[in-house]
Design a protein with these regions (language model features):
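A structural signal for well-ordered alpha-helical segments within the folded catalytic domains
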Residues: 103, 248, 289-292, 296, ...
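Short beta-strand segments
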Residues: 307-309, 361-368, 405-408, 430-435, ...
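Histidine-centered active-site microenvironments of extracellular/periplasmic hydrolases
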Residues: 241-245, 427-428, 434-477
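Metal-dependent active-site segment of extracytoplasmic phospho-/sulfohydrolases and closely related
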Residues: 225-226, 407-450, 498-501
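Non-catalytic, well-ordered alpha-helical segments in soluble enzyme domains
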Residues: 299, 473, 478-505
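A long, amphipathic alpha-helix that forms part
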Residues: 50, 347-350, 388-431, 492-493
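Transmembrane and membrane-interface helices of multi-pass
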Residues: 2-179
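Active-site-proximal alpha/beta segments of enzymes that process anionic O-linked groups
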Residues: 157-226, 231-391, 499-501, 505
Length: 506
């Protein structure tokens, strides 16, 4: 212990803490496309601020523990760099922390072992060392604090000196608010403000009114089912030309129309799904705080509305919109199972189709292809093997793709069953399917994985959009079918589903 005390003096602990706090800045200098001079400022100015904070107490461990929120964000930033390869923590990533349930989080973290172990090894010993620093009777001397203060001032002066020409040449990139951790805390503040605004949604949207009416015969039976997909990218659908026939059932249905060029507006579920269901769009997202969903429009037009979800409540706009429905059901998995498969929704669909309502809108929010992929399907959809991975790594890429493709097979089976149920009613009906976003699967040299990255890839944006119309609908409204087929190659974004649902039921 005496030898330990001699090695870990308060001064050495001080410099260890300074280095640890700088680690995210150092990594970001390598991952971000920043001007060279600004990279110097990226180290000097935050580094000086860390020094100034650490000399606030003569025991650096006290300050280090007081800065725990900074270390938490630093650990989060390092994990995201491992996952996405670049970019500062975006506000949507902070919102994902609020809206992602613990089961999903543990499924992912379990496969990110290198990153998680790395941040634990970096921060946990440091926090333990901070406790040791607090308990030691030795303190930093006033002379040491004075010298560190002078060093910090020199670093700030040098940082500003090189910042000025960098900012003059690159005014949009080389900005003080682009320095870590200032940018991360700004994004965190924006996320908290957005979360608070969402909580006020029932009040801010109370007066919204579609004034919707139906132009069709009130006695005409109509049933429309909108299936919200999860993490399904068009590139892995056989229907879209994928080398594997992952959609054999939909391929065999001549009445199924798929749209080739549809992009999601946002690559994160907590925003992309609400934007499917209301008139707001990504460029005018704040409009969502004052709007209600298409569920309210259908209710005003005389439809019985239902929202069935295989996902958990999470306090997002999806939950607010779901509660507008006449019938809202969330399916909870038993304790010994991580998540129910989507076919749990089918029995509820059967019940709704038999309640005797003339006009119905049914929305099914599936779990689709959400990671961990191999847990999203039964054995009869386990076509491609091996399909289990222990960690996210390039050597496991094929097994990961196999599992993902099997989840698409399960989606194909599910949609075919929904179509069959609608077809058997003999009523005027349609089924629309649109995924919320796609997914990265270590596709190229960037080795990107998952979705919701601050800079999305095409794999995250290109999503499948599929429509099926019943024979009765085709007979009554042939122009709609003709128009859909003629426009199946037209570029759309995910707003198309809101407009399509309103149009086919008007």
């Amino acid at each position: 212990m005496k030898h330990f005390n001699q090695i870990f003096t308060q001064r050495r602990i001080f410099w260890i803490f300074s280095g640890i706090m700088l680690v995210p800045n150092i990594f970001l200098c390598f991952t971000e496309q920043l001007p060279l001079l600004f990279k110097v400022s990226y180290i000097l100015i935050p580094g000086a601020l860390y020094l100034l904070l650490l000399i606030l107490s003569r025991k650096p461990g006290i300050t280090f523990w007081a800065l725990f929120p900074l270390h938490f964000i630093g650990a989060f930033q390092l994990v995201l760099l491992y996952l996405f390869g670049n970019s500062i923590i975006a506000s949507d990533m902070f919102l994902n922390m609020f809206t992602t349930n613990s089961g999903e989080a543990f499924e992912l973290l379990d496969k990110l072992a290198p990153a998680v172990v790395g941040v634990f090894l970096l921060y946990l010993p440091a926090l333990a060392l901070a406790v040791y620093s607090i308990r030691r009777t030795e303190t930093l001397t006033p002379l040491f604090q004075k010298r560190v203060f002078m060093l910090a001032m020199l670093m700030i002066g040098s940082g500003i000196l090189v910042y000025t020409p960098a900012h003059r040449k690159y005014p949009h990139t080389a900005r003080l608010d682009n320095l870590y951790p200032i940018n991360a805390f700004n994004n965190a503040r924006f996320a908290v403000d957005s979360w608070e605004a969402a909580k006020n949604y029932p009040r801010t949207s109370r007066k919204f009114d579609y004034r919707a009416t139906s132009t069709r015969d009130t006695e005409l039976p109509e049933i429309y089912i909108f299936v919200i997909g999860e993490t399904s990218r068009a590139g892995n659908w056989g229907l879209y030309g994928y080398e594997r026939n992952t959609t054999p059932k939909l391929d065999a249905m001549p009445d199924v129309i798929h749209f080739d060029d549809v992009l999601t507006q946002i690559n994160a579920t907590h925003k992309s799904v609400p934007l499917m269901l209301c008139p707001a769009d990504a460029l005018n997202y704040n409009e969502i705080y004052r709007q209600k969903s298409l569920i309210s429009a259908f209710k005003q037009a005389g439809f019985h509305t239902s929202f069935l979800s295989n996902q958990l409540r999470n306090g997002s706009f999806t939950e607010f919109f779901a509660d507008e429905a006449d019938c809202t059901i969330y399916f909870a998995a038993p304790k010994n199972k991580p998540h129910l498969h989507d076919d749990v929704l089918l029995s509820a669909v059967d019940s709704l189709l038999n309640i005797g309502k003339t006009k119905q809108l049914i929305i099914l929010h599936t779990y689709g292809s959400h990671f961990n992929y191999c847990e999203r399907y039964d054995t009869d959809c386990r076509i491609f093997t091996p399909d289990h991975i222990k960690e996210i790594d390039h050597k496991n890429k094929q097994a990961m793709i196999n599992a993902y493709d099997n989840s698409i097979v399960a989606t194909d089976k599910f949609l075919a069953q929904v179509i069959d149920k609608l077809d058997r009613t003999g009523k005027t009906s349609a089924m629309l399917y649109l995924s919320d976003h796609g997914e990265d699967l270590l596709d190229d040299e960037r080795n990107r994985f998952l979705h919701a990255s601050p800079i999305p890839t095409y794999y995250q944006l290109h999503i499948p959009f599929v429509i099926w119309f019943s024979d009765n609908y085709s007979t009554l409204f042939p122009d709609d079918i003709r128009q859909a087929r003629n426009r199946h190659t037209t570029p759309f974004d995910s707003r198309v589903v809101f407009l399509s649902l309103i149009h086919i039921s008007e």
